[in-house]
């Protein structure tokens, strides 16, 4: 049970209410400093999650060009072999 007390969502005793902003739009209003800590924790966690995803997307994007290059290389090699074979037999 003591380990659970270290997590921000267990420590948060405040609650989020809404306040009217400009244009009558309701926005969340944090009423406890632990709620602010929870929001900061969530933001940091999201940032840690987003970065590896961006790296994965870049790797996928970079690997997209490789199959195309491999396809072109094999196609050219096949045509070259066919051409060479054809020249050899004639």
Swiss-Prot record:
Alphabetical list of InterPro entries matching this protein: Flu_proapoptotic_PB1-F2
Residues annotated as transmembrane: none
Main location: host cell
Cystine bridges: none
Cellular component terms (Gene Ontology): host cell cytosol; host cell mitochondrial inner membrane; host cell nucleus; membrane
Region (Disordered): 1-30
Spans annotated as Mitochondrial targeting sequence: 65-87
Site feature location: Low pathogenicity: 66
Locations listed in the record: Host mitochondrion inner membrane; Host nucleus; Host cytoplasm, Host cytosol
Residue ranges with Polar residues bias: 14-28
Keywords linked to the UniProt accession: Apoptosis, Host cytoplasm, Host membrane, Host mitochondrion, Host mitochondrion inner membrane, Host nucleus, Host-virus interaction, Inhibition of host innate immune response by virus, Inhibition of host MAVS by virus, Inhibition of host RLR pathway by virus, Membrane, Modulation of host cell apoptosis by virus, Viral immunoevasion
GO biological process: symbiont-mediated perturbation of host apoptosis; symbiont-mediated suppression of host cytoplasmic pattern recognition receptor signaling pathway via inhibition of MAVS activity
Lineage: superkingdom: Viruses
Recorded family membership: Belongs to the influenza viruses PB1-F2 family.
Note: Is not encoded in all strains, and seems to be dispensable for replication.
Subunit structure, as described in the record: Oligomer. Interacts with human SLC25A6/ANT3 and VDAC1. Interacts with host MAVS.
Described function: Plays an important role in promoting lung pathology in both primary viral infection and secondary bacterial infection. Promotes alteration of mitochondrial morphology, dissipation of mitochondrial membrane potential, and cell death. Alternatively, inhibits the production of interferon in the infected cell at the level of host mitochondrial antiviral signaling MAVS. Its level of expression differs greatly depending on which cell type is infected, in a manner that is independent of the levels of expression of other viral proteins. Monocytic cells are more affected than epithelial cells.
Protein name, per record: Protein PB1-F2
Organism for this UniProt entry: Influenza A virus (strain A/Hickox/1940 H1N1)
Lineage, top ranks: Viruses, Riboviria, Orthornavirae, Negarnaviricota, Polyploviricotina
């Amino acid at each position: 049970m003591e380990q659970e007390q270290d997590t921000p969502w267990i420590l948060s005793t405040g609650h989020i209410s809404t306040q009217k902003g400009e244009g009558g739009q309701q926005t969340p209003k944090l009423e406890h400093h632990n709620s602010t800590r929870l929001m900061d924790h969530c933001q940091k966690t999201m940032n840690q999650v987003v970065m590896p995803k961006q790296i994965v997307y870049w790797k996928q994007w970079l690997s997209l060009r490789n199959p195309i290059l491999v396809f072109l290389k094999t196609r050219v090699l096949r045509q070259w072999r066919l051409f060479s074979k054809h020249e050899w037999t004639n």
